[in-house]
Structures are given as C-alpha cells and as structure tokens.
Curated annotation (Swiss-Prot):
Keywords: Cell membrane, Membrane, Transmembrane, Transmembrane helix. It comes from Bacillus subtilis (strain 168). It comes from the Bacteria. The chain crosses the membrane at residues 11-31, 34-54, 60-80, 89-109. InterPro entries: DUF2512. It is a multi-pass membrane protein. The gene is ycbP. One of its GO terms (cellular component) is plasma membrane. This is Uncharacterized protein YcbP. Its main location: membrane. It is found in: Cell membrane.
Length: 128
C-alpha cells in the first residue's frame, strides 16, 4: 500500500508539473502530457526512487531524475509535438526537467521519511 500511495503522490505532482510546463507553456495536449506522466512516473519511480535514492543520496537521485525527465520528455515530445522544431522540444524538455527535479527533490524527503525502497535495498545488499 505504501508504494500505491507514493506512486499516487508522484503521479499527481508529475501531471501538474508537466501540464503547467508542457501543456500551458508549449501547447502539448493533455493526453500527451498524461502519457508522458505515466511513462516518466513508472521509470523514475523504479530507477530513481527505489534504486538510486536508497543507494546514494537525495542530490544524486535528483540529478538522475533530472536527466531521466529530460530524456523522456524530449524523446516522447519529438513525435508528439505538432509543428515544433527539435530545439523547441529540447527547450520544453529542459524546462520540464528543471521543474520536475525541484518536485522530485521534495518527493524524496517523503520517500526517505517513510523508508520506502530502503528495505529492498538492504535485502539485496545482504544477499550478495
């Protein structure tokens, strides 16, 4: 249940951030933004929140989330954007990734306070 709650919080944060930046700022549709939210949310939760954050620290996990957000938004944004140049999509991805990184930095405090991901990390570390 803790993962469901964490994913819900992350999903709400991500859809709000991406719609404000990409939808209102760059003209992406809500459907495109929702699709990016789902893909980015699942990948960043598994890699950033459950693997990188428990293993290293908040700053490293935030930097990883920034890079991941930029890549996902840029790569998904290229075919989804109508009439935007590659540079415009990259700019949208940069702004989206910056705001997502700020949100992820705060979200990581929630993850650490609930020790979500820590148990999995400790189990895999003691198994080897």
């Amino acid at each position: 249940m803790t993962h469901v709650k964490a994913l819900a919080i992350k999903g709400i944060m991500t859809i709000i951030v991406l719609y404000l930046v990409l939808g209102l700022g760059f003209g992406f549709t809500f459907g495109d933004t929702l699709l990016m939210t789902i893909v980015l949310g699942v990948i960043s939760y598994l890699l950033g929140d459950l693997y990188v954050l428990p293993k290293w620290n908040n700053m490293i996990a935030t930097l990883a989330d920034f890079g991941l957000a930029f890549l996902v938004i840029w790569l998904m944004g290229m075919p989804l954007s109508m009439g935007m140049t590659g540079g415009e999509v990259a700019l949208a991805a940069l702004f989206g990734a910056i705001v997502m990184a700020i949100g992820e930095y705060c979200f990581h405090f929630y993850m650490m306070s609930k020790e979500i991901g820590k148990k999995h990390y400790l189990e895999t570390r003691t198994d080897s």
